[in-house]
């Protein structure tokens, strides 16, 4: 039995990650594909993260970074097991979000990556670009929904993409019409599922 693929969607807030994940789930109807999003707000760490994001509680940046990281590690074994059982996971945000947001607040990229080192490695990371319209919509109730901060996050994403580090990035332009974007992403995901080989890798090892 071939293993499943770990396919991650990344991008700024309101870039359409969840929409595209749901498009994939609807357009590839199969019992071998599951959706997972981060942060998972139902866990102990997730509830603390939710309180922070919704401004109910405050923590220093180092604690916040570790909470987000721990939230992903809570699901590392689950992800590994699902992939080995032939289940493809469509993941809405992953370690790259953690690093981009942490470094946008001034954390060391090397240190931030070290916290995530060893997590199951994605077979494909789809980065959804945001046009100026989408970026300017980033004003909301949650703590990171701020235009200036999102611009900083974008620069950190660009650094990771440029560095590469054996990560298969696929950048989707914000210029595409929605129906074209949907079809393009579906084809990219199908190809990734059909071509995945070898054991599950470890991220940043």
UniProtKB/Swiss-Prot annotation:
Gene: OPG178
GO biological process: dTDP biosynthetic process; dTTP biosynthetic process; dUDP biosynthetic process
Catalytic activity: dTMP + ATP = dTDP + ADP
Domain of life: Viruses
Family annotation (Pfam families): Thymidylate_kin
MF terms in GO: ATP binding; dTMP kinase activity; nucleoside diphosphate kinase activity
Function of the protein: Poxvirus TMP kinase is able to phosphorylate dTMP, dUMP and also dGMP from any purine and pyrimidine nucleoside triphosphate. The large substrate specificity is explained by the presence of a canal connecting the edge of the dimer interface to the TMP base binding pocket, canal not found in the human homolog.
Species in which this protein is naturally found: Variola virus (isolate Human/India/Ind3/1967) (VARV)
InterPro entries attached to this UniProt entry: P-loop_NTPase, Thymidylate_kin-like_dom, Thymidylate_kinase
Record's protein name: Thymidylate kinase
